[in-house]
C-alpha cells in the first residue's frame, strides 16, 4: 500500500500559474486547473492520527443530553433471548449493547454480507464495492464509542480540517476550520474567509446564522435543540432566506452540504436537519473535522463489530430473511410477537425469542409490519416516511484525477497524489465524492493504477432507470468538467450501486412521524437511523438508536420474563388440550 497516503502531497515542482479575481472579489494566483494558492506557508502535513484518543468532540458536556447517553447501569434482571432482524449498524449496535449486559442474541440478515447501508463486498475481480460514501464527523461519539469497544479505534484516518468545494474548471473553494482558537471562533473565521461565496453572500450568510438557534447552543444546548426541533416544519431554504440568506449561498455552498447529509437539496430538506449539524459545528471545535476509514467498511468497520459480537456469544444468520411477524392478541387487547417466520432459499423455520428487534431501513420495516398493526397510529406514521433513491458510482482511472498542481505528477502511477479529503461540488450531479485511493488507501490504492473516485449521485431519481453504461458516461463527463487537467486519463474500471430507498427523506414536517424504539407491541422493538433520536439519519443516528433500543429492552426485562412465562403456559395449555382430544378420539 502507498506509504504516502498519510500525507498531504504538496509538490514543489513547477506548475502553470495565472492571476485571476475570485468570487469574493480578492485577487490571487491559480495553479494549472484552477486551484487557488494559499497565502499561508505550505508545508508537508504531519502523519495523520488514526486513533480516537484526540481530535474528538466531548459530547458529554455542553451538548444536548440525548446525543450521547451516559453509560448504562449494570443489568441485574433476567437473561433474555433476543432476535434481531437486520445486520446493519443499528442492528449490530443493539446486539453489542445487549451482549454486554449478558443477554443471548441472534442476528438475521437476508443479504450475504453485513453492514446494511455501510456494508461492502468484494466482487469476482477483487474490487471492494461500497453501498455509499461514508464520512465520520468529529462529533460521532456514539459510533466512536462503539469502535473503541470493538477494537476498531485505529481504523479511521483524520483529514485536513477543511471542507473542500470543487467548482467547474478545477476552481477550489474552502471552508477552512484550521484556526488557532477553537469553537465558535474557528467556525466564524471559516465562514467569513471562505472563497466559495462572494462578499455580499458571505455577509448575508453571517446574518442568517447569527439569527439562528446556533447562537443559543453556545450557552443552552438543550434549549437550542428544542428550538431547532420546532423548525422541522419548514425547509432550510425557507428558513435561511427568511433570515436574510441568499439564493447564491444555497446554490454554491448549502445545497452540496444538504445533498451530502440527506440526499436532498435545501428546498426539500428540513431546517431541523441542517441546523442540528450547524449547532454542533458552532459549539464543538472538532465536530466539523472529518475522518474516513482506512479501507473498506467490511474490513475496518463491520468486520471488527462482527468479531466482537461472535466473541461475546452472539450469532449471525446470513441469507435468512423474515417473511412474516407472527403475533397473538391477549384477552385485554394487547399484542405480542409469538415468532418470526424466516426463510433461506427453500428452507423455512419459526424463530422464537423473548424480545424481537426490527433493525431495518424504512422500506424494510414497512414490509415487515403486520397489516393489523398499521391501524395503530404508531405504526401508521411509519408509512408517512419514504426513502431517498441514491446511486453510488466508482471510477478507476489510469492517473490521478484530483491532482491540480502538477500535470506530470497526475500521469505517473508510482505515487498517490491529489486531494485527500471529502469533496463537495455544486457543479455536478454528484454532490460529494472522494478519491478512495487517497482517502482510504488500504483497500483502494492499487500499485500501478490511479484514482478511484467514489461519487454519490443525489438526487438519484433521474439515474435509477438508466443503464450502468450511460451512468458511467455521464459521470465521467462531469468529472472532466470539474478537473480539466484530467483530460486524457481513461476509466479502466467502474461500478454502479443503485439503492431505491436509502436514508428517509428528511423533509419538512416529517420528524414527528419517526417512531420510538419502544413500540405498542410488548416484546417488539425498533432500531434504525430513521427512528426517533436527537441526531439525523446517519451512521451516528443508527448507532444511537441501537443504544436506545437496548436500553428499552433492559428496562422491560422483568415484563418480558413474565410474558415468556405467559406464552409458555399458553402453549402448554394448547398441548394439553391436544393430548386430551387425542385420548378422547382413541376411546371412540
UniProtKB/Swiss-Prot annotation:
Classification lineage: Eukaryota, Viridiplantae, Streptophyta, Embryophyta, Tracheophyta
Predominant location: plastid
Associated pathway: Carotenoid biosynthesis; lycopene biosynthesis
Function: Catalyzes the conversion of zeta-carotene to lycopene via the intermediary of neurosporene. Shows stereoselectivity toward trans C15-C15'zeta-carotene double bond. The zeta-carotene produced by the phytoene desaturase PDS has a C15-C15' double bond in the cis configuration and it requires isomerization before being recognized as substrate by ZDS. No activity with all-trans-zeta-carotene. The main product is 7,9,7',9'-tetra-cis-lycopene (pro-lycopene).
Name of this protein: Zeta-carotene desaturase, chloroplastic/chromoplastic
Gene name of the encoded protein: ZDS
Oligomer status and interactors: Monomer and dimer.
GO biological process entries: carotenoid biosynthetic process
Organism annotation: Capsicum annuum (Capsicum pepper)
Cofactor: decylplastoquinone; 6-decylubiquinone
Family listed: Belongs to the zeta carotene desaturase family.
Transit peptide: 1-49
Catalyses which reaction(s): 9,9'-di-cis-zeta-carotene + 2 a quinone = 7,7',9,9'-tetra-cis-lycopene + 2 a quinol
A GO cellular component annotation in the UniProt record: chloroplast
MF GO annotations: 9,9'-di-cis-zeta-carotene desaturase activity
Top-level taxonomic group: Eukaryota
